[in-house]
């Protein structure tokens, strides 16, 4: 094997020069903070609920594995604020979104920014009048207990998933079903 032709010091110097060159290629910040980079025209009307309308959300998504569960909660909250009767049903692995025991190093702490977003969003949804159901079997699959649930979340029998869907469909609910593998 041939001996290196450049010393570690020369390599480090070349790396530093390349970093400086890379940083200088595009001016930063490219746009000042607050610059609009997207239009703001809303295409559809800002619909509000008509008397008796219902919005039902099914969530089968794992907390923090993607934004699926969090966005579903935000959508259900928006529907609630538009005047819809709004309910969320967490089933399967989605049930673990409902635990109050999330946190690191202690319950309620955020081990990373946003760790408590789901808990806080669910507490807000419940406080504003939304109903939240959590499948007991989904909880059991992940070692969560009913006493671990966020206050106000309603534990539900596994067979209630289908019957809740039938119930809300018969009420004419708009049904938002999310699913994550």
Model-inferred region functions:
Residues 106-138:
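A glycine-rich helix N-cap at a beta->alpha junction
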